């Protein structure tokens, strides 16, 4: 089973894996069963909890939700609440604004830029935000006497004095922001309520904020989202989409909404808007359509469980107001005929509510309802849960079956996988629309703000391509493609492990595939230097128990590796095999789906990759690049959440064992929710140092940690807690042991895009492009690298943030080393997007979180058994 196929088979949550038959089965005549063995009985009206004009439900509560964390900026709870609504969820990246790590790294305080490499002209998806001279944002606190609870009322009373405060303002019920300063520091005004009650309003100046203050940065983002709403963009999650410009793909019953991601932050020289293209994929089938389709596929007694498995966790879009909700539960005891209490105390059925409120007719009166634990506050009241009618909800996203449909993905890519020139054109449309919209321009003028009309241009660098070293041979590769599979195909490996005693397990229907694999392995292994005997071939029934029984009976202490030919990508069978061979009976294993061997024209290429994988899993070494630094240990860490319980976090920890970076120590930390993952990482580091000493007879003098899996808002915790824990761990190794430590945070999910200017057009920057100016952050020692090549669409850079460094290595050296390590991932004969130890750590954590669900046996720790 190839890594890519395995990721697709296992890498998505259960709610995304349904096979979707033809849609349109729903009709008023059909009835979904309420219980496995009986049709729904007539229901008495049910009474969900009272809510304000949003139908609430009787869904089972799944425990209290986590309260939103307070932002690290001193604004107000109300302003945070306002910003959450306008920002599209919790923008945890604002927590990282106050983390200034560069000042503590002495050798980069003055300059963090490198100089090696050839210059390249680049354009980035950034627009400068400018403000008028001496611009400031004025922050006021507003008090009411007597106290007014409702935010809408507080706003109405304050806005009676727009002659004083002006029409340009942002108010959250407590904090008022103005683009001008009021005449007095404290201003008292009086307003009247509708019933004639006098209210004294005290407006007190609390802050005069410069353009670069963290509060202003947050404020800019809120104003920008206000502008998007003015242009009729629809907020879905964090991003904004244009429902009036949809792209229809009728032959696949899909709709694509174009949209944008956006963020305004302080960068090296200026405050800038980073805008990128985003697409929302909608399906033209409703949840009810899907339920009826599923009902035709499964046994009646399993129907409700199947619905829960497929729908809980899925995001749906309501057809009446284009809002998205997460399905948290299905209430089979309610239906559209049930009633709920409105804010005025009157009762209304869901049928009547949706007809009066949205002019939506509900045809199936016996369908169950969906429950969304909608987490949003109105004033001091938490709104939720929300009841949704399946018939009125469209499904979003793609199922696993859709993702495996080559023609569908090809047709979808035409609209979503944009070339650099297409992407630049689409991003430019955003600012063009803003320029043409008079309301938007007036809002910006009133605040004293404006955006550049052209994208940011600057100069980057392209470092030289690496030479691939393989058993005395040196290979160059085409740097434009960053792939050396052809060049190294006939060369022996650095260290080839023999296939003396190995098992090949297959089913009767897959005998031909097993035989083809064996014959082709005999063809490709000699040039690699792999000595190979014929496998012990064992036929089994196509059942999980049969595979496990054969494994238990056939594996001996001399077995090198087990190869299993599987009929399909069935996750339960794969998981059972991997769990047994990674924990109970530790031995390297290779699973291959039979159909991947079915095409004669690609069989040799596929078997070559399988042979390389098998060699790695047994402890072999494939290739290397020149690493000038000596006595250097590289560590990669990545985190993953267990799919079985959702309550475990898994950290993959991978550390180099030799100076050539060709052998790795791998270990996993499985932590329950609430436990600190770093405690387990300390133990991993101690064990890795012991293993390094066994291999080299000395300890490393430098340790560089590449830390992936750090979410937005977690940077402060990593710097102030995780890094000190690593330092404490090193002290326990020995009194005189004081290696130089570097910790680099790796971030793949970035909106930044670079376009290379070439011959009057734009193309992707070549692999090895480094950017450490303009779009990096002044308070960080950070840089971007474009390491991989892509055939279609736009290449995505990776962001590296050096948060701790006592190495005193020049920025050039850190950047070059990072790029070198992107060549060392043995599951791909080419350059990948992150340093190899990060990808190894990800693969390990992914395998444990998806299939094994416990720590693998340590006897495998010196092999890349998880590739």
From Swiss-Prot:
GO cellular component terms listed in the entry, alphabetical order: chromatoid body; cytoplasm; dense body; nucleus; P granule
InterPro entries, alphabetized: ArgoL1 (IPR014811), GAGE (IPR031320), PAZ_dom (IPR003100), PAZ_dom_sf (IPR036085), Piwi (IPR003165), RNaseH-like_sf (IPR012337), RNaseH_sf (IPR036397)
Start and end residues of each stretch annotated as Required for binding 2'-O-methylated 3'-end of piRNAs: 324-326
SUPFAM superfamilies: PAZ domain, Ribonuclease H-like
GO biological process, any: primary piRNA processing
Functional description taken from the UniProt entry: Endoribonuclease that plays a central role in postnatal germ cells by repressing transposable elements and preventing their mobilization, which is essential for the germline integrity. Acts via the piRNA metabolic process, which mediates the repression of transposable elements during meiosis by forming complexes composed of piRNAs and Piwi proteins and govern the methylation and subsequent repression of transposons.
Cellular localization per UniProt: Cytoplasm
Domain Piwi, chain residue ranges per copy: 561-853
Residue numbers spanned by region Disordered: 1-70
Ranges of biased composition (kind: Polar residues): 28-44
Family the UniProt entry places it in: Belongs to the argonaute family. Piwi subfamily.
A Gene Ontology molecular function term of the record: mRNA binding
Domain PAZ: from-to ranges: 286-397
EC number(s) reported in the record: 3.1.26.-
Name of the protein described by the UniProt record: Piwi-like protein 1
Cofactor(s) required, per the database record: Mg(2+)
Residue ranges with Basic residues bias: 1-11
Keywords: Cytoplasm, Developmental protein, Differentiation, Endonuclease, Hydrolase, Magnesium, Meiosis, Metal-binding, Methylation, Nuclease, RNA-binding, RNA-mediated gene silencing, Translation regulation
Primary residence: cytoplasm
Any coiled-coil regions, as ranges: none
PTM (free text): Methylated on arginine residues; required for the interaction with Tudor domain-containing protein and subsequent localization to the meiotic nuage, also named P granule.
Lineage of source species: Eukaryota, Metazoa, Chordata, Craniata, Vertebrata
Annotated active site: 638, 676, 708, 842
Annotated organism of origin: Gallus gallus
Entry note about domains: The PAZ domain specifically recognizes binds the 2'-O-methylated 3'-end of piRNAs. The MID region is required for recognition of uridine in the first position of piRNAs (g1U preference, also named 1U-bias).
Segments for region (MID region): 485-621
């Amino acid at each position: 089973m190839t890594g890519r196929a395995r990721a697709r088979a296992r890498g998505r949550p259960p709610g995304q894996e349904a096979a979707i038959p033809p849609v349109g089965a729903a009709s008023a005549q059909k009835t979904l069963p309420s219980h496995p063995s009986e049709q729904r009985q007539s229901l008495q009206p049910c009474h969900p909890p009272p809510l304000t004009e949003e139908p609430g439900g009787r869904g089972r509560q799944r425990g209290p939700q986590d309260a939103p964390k307070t932002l690290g900026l001193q604004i107000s709870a109300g302003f945070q609440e306002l910003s959450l609504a306008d920002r599209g969820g919790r923008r945890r990246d604002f927590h990282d604004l106050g983390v200034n790590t560069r000042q503590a790294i002495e050798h980069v305080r003055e300059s963090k830029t490198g100089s090696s490499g050839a210059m390249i002209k680049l354009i980035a998806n950034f627009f400068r935000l400018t403000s008028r001279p001496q611009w400031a944002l004025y922050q006021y606190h507003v008090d009411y006497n007597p106290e007014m609870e409702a935010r809408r009322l507080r706003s109405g009373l304050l806005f009676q004095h727009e002659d004083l405060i002006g029409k340009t303002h942002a108010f959250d019920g407590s904090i008022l922001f103005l683009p001008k300063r009021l005449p007095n520091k404290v201003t008292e005004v009086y307003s009247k309520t509708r019933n004639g009650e006098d209210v004294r309003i005290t407006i007190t100046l609390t802050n005069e904020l410069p353009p670069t203050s963290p509060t202003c940065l947050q404020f800019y983002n809120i104003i920008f989202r206000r502008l998007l709403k003015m242009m009729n963009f629809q907020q879905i999650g964090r991003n904004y989409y244009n429902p009036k410009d949809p792209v229809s793909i009728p032959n696949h019953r899909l709709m694509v909404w174009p949209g944008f991601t956006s963020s305004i932050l302080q960068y090296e020289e200026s405050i800038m808007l980073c805008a990128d293209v985003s697409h929302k994929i909608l399906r033209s089938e409703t949840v009810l359509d899907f339920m009826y389709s599923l009902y035709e596929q499964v046994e009646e007694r399993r129907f409700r469980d199947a619905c829960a498995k497929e729908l809980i966790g899925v995001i749906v879009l309501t057809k009446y107001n284009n809002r998205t909700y997460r399905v948290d539960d299905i209430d089979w005891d309610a239906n559209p005929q049930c009633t709920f209490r409105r804010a005025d105390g009157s009762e209304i059925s869901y049928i009547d509510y949706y007809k009066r409120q949205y002019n939506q007719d509900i045809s199936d009166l016996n369908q169950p309802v969906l429950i969304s634990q909608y987490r949003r506050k109105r004033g001091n009241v938490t709104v939720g849960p929300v009841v949704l009618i399946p018939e009125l909800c469209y499904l979003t996203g793609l199922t696993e079956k859709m993702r495996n449909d080559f023609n569908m993905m090809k047709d979808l890519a035409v609209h979503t996988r944009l070339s650099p020139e297409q992407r630049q054109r689409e991003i430019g449309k955003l600012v063009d629309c803003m320029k043409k919209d008079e309301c938007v321009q007036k809002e910006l003028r009133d605040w004293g703000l404006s955006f550049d009309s052209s994208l940011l241009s600057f100069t980057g660098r392209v470092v030289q391509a690496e030479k691939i070293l393989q058993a005395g041979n040196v290979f160059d590769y085409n740097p434009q493609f960053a792939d050396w599979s052809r060049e190294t195909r006939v060369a022996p490996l650095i260290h080839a492990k023999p296939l003396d005693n190995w098992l090949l397990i297959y089913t009767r229907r897959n005998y031909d595939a097993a035989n083809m694999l064996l014959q082709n392995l005999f063809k490709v292994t000699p040039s690699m230097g792999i000595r190979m005997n014929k496998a012990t071939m064992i036929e089994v029934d196509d059942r999980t128990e049969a595979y496990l029984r054969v494994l238990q009976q056939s594996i001996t202490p001399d077995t090198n590796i087990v190869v299993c030919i599987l009929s399909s990508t069935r996750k339960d069978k794969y998981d059972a095999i991997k769990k047994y061979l990674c924990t109970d009976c530790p031995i390297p294993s290779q699973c291959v789906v039979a159909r991947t061997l079915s095409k004669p024209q690609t069989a040799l290429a596929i078997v070559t990759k399988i042979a390389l994988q098998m060699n790695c899993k047994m402890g072999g070494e494939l290739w290397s690049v020149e690493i000038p630094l000596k006595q250097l240990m590289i560590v990669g860490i990545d985190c993953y959440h267990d799919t079985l319980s959702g309550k475990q976090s898994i950290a993959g920890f991978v550390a180099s064992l030799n100076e050539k970076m060709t052998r790795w120590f791998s270990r996993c930390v499985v932590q329950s929710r609430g436990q600190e993952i770093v405690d387990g990482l300390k133990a991993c580091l101690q064990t890795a140092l012991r293993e390094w000493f066994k291999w080299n007879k000395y300890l490393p003098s430098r340790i560089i940690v590449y830390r992936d899996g750090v979410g937005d808002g977690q940077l402060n915790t990593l710097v102030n807690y995780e890094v000190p824990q690593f330092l404490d761990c090193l002290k326990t190794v020995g009194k005189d042991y004081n290696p130089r430590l570097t910790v680099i945070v790796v971030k793949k999910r970035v909106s930044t895009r670079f376009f290379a200017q070439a011959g009057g057009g734009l193309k992707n920057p070549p692999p090895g492009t480094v950017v450490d100016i303009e779009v990096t952050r002044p308070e960080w020692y950070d840089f971007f690298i474009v390491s991989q090549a892509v055939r279609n669409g736009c290449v995505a850079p990776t962001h590296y943030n050096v948060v701790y460094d006592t190495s005193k290595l020049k920025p050039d050296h850190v950047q070059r080393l990072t790029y070198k390590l992107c060549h060392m991932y043995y599951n791909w004969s080419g350059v990948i997007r992150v340093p190899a130890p990060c990808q190894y750590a990800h693969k390990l954590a992914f395998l444990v979180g998806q299939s094994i669900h416990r720590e693998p046996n340590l006897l495998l720790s010196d092999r890349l058994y998880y590739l």
